[in-house]
Regions:
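Peripheral, non-AAA+ core regions of ATP-driven protein-machinery
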Residues: 4-211, 215
């Protein structure tokens, strides 16, 4: 799986790969990850467990390449989760090949939006990635780059489904809440004014014209 170092001003991909082997059960990250990226191991492990993905006790090693660039940001959670699932053969390694991914995973498996989606999608375009997987919250922003297929996912279950069958997620519509244009709190209106029928009538007639009111109402 691919991701991108947001702190890198150059379009350099970060390849995330995982391996499982016999030995003392552990979860190790190598390849110059920052302290923030290392926290992904607990988020990912807990999120996978809470969503029914049970792993045998193994030694898990996650590598970030190239190793000469420091990896920063919570956006590596999604590619780490995908790499671990592929390493345990819960998804085929082929489905994560040449796919750009980014997103932060909560302990409940929900995938949260991150900053810097546009550079990630642009990087995917320059690298010729098959498609991008981003948090659903970032889908609208990601699709500003027209010539790159972008899928939005809300949780781990959707991530797995998307990797196995991306077409429905690449065609997914963006559901936006349309704010009401009706203001139910209008404050005072003419019904609150006692008398002054002539002034109110004049205001009604002049509502589409300029009106200057002088003196007390």
């Amino acid at each position: 799986c691919l991701s991108r170092g947001l702190g890198d001003v150059y379009k350099r991909q970060v390849q995330v790969e995982a391996d499982v082997s016999n030995g003392l059960p552990s979860f190790i990250m190598v390849g110059f990850p920052s302290a923030q990226v290392k926290e992904a191991q607990e988020r990912v492990r807990t999120a996978l467990k809470n969503n029914g993905y049970q792993f045998p006790p193994k030694r898990i090693t996650v590598n970030f390449a190239p190793a000469d660039m420091k990896k920063e940001g919570a956006g590596f959670d999604v590619p780490v989760a995908a790499a671990v699932l592929a390493a345990f053969e819960m998804i085929s390694p082929q489905v994560v090949s040449r796919v750009m991914m980014a997103g932060e995973i909560g302990l409940d498996g929900e995938i949260h939006g991150i900053s810097g989606i546009l550079p990630i999608v642009l990087c995917a375009r320059s690298l010729g990635s098959r498609f991008c997987v981003v948090p659903y919250e970032n889908l609208k922003e990601g699709r500003l780059i027209r010539d790159v297929p972008v899928a939005g996912v809300k949780n781990l279950r959707e991530l797995v489904e998307c990797l196995k069958n991306p077409e429905p997620y690449l065609k997914r519509e963006i559901q936006e809440e349309i704010p009401s244009i009706i203001n139910t709190d209008m404050g005072m209106d003419f019904s609150d004014i006692e008398g002054q029928e002539g002034a109110k009538r004049a205001a009604e007639i002049a509502v589409s014209l300029s009106l200057i009111h002088i003196s007390e109402p």
